[in-house]
Amino acid sequence: MKKDDRFAELDASGITAECLVETSDGWDGSPLPNYPEGTPVISIYRYVFPPHSVTADHFHKIINCGVVTKGQITLVCANGREKTVMAGEAVVEIDGEVHHGENCGDIPAEVIMFYAGDGKIPFSFPA
């Protein structure tokens, strides 16, 4: 693994860091929104999707991303575009586009999601 100078605490420790994603764009290539004004509030949530479950259609106004830790999740946009994210893969959500998430698998899927907001803007809005 290539040494990354941003992690001084890892020098000579044997600990490694692997970048799963680093981007200014959502998974579809659209630019991410600016951070909200005011004090930042970082939230991390664990979602568990039962087999064959589907979220309601929704959209986001804040930056959010996640890592699938078990199973797989498919993100489906209202316009038909979709992306399947497997266990161990990361995804940066798209801003303002109506979509839903679904677990098409036969086992529960688990996703750890990170939200960068201000504590006032909801994580998602119903479509």
What does each model-identified segment do?
Residues 1-41, 126-127:
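A short, N-terminal "cap"/entry segment at the start of jelly-roll beta-barrel domains
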Residues 37-41, 52-65:
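A short beta-loop-beta micro-motif enriched in histidine and acidic residues
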Residues 54-55, 71-76, 90:
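Short beta-strand segments in beta-sandwich/barrel cores
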Residues 59, 67, 104-108:
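Extracellular/periplasmic catalytic domains that process cell-envelope and extracellular macromolecules
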Residues 61-79:
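Glycine- and acidic-residue-biased ligand/ion/polar-headgroup-sensing regions
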Residues 79-96:
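Short acidic-glycine-tyrosine-enriched beta hairpin
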Residues 95-121:
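Ligand-binding loop in jelly-roll beta-barrel domains
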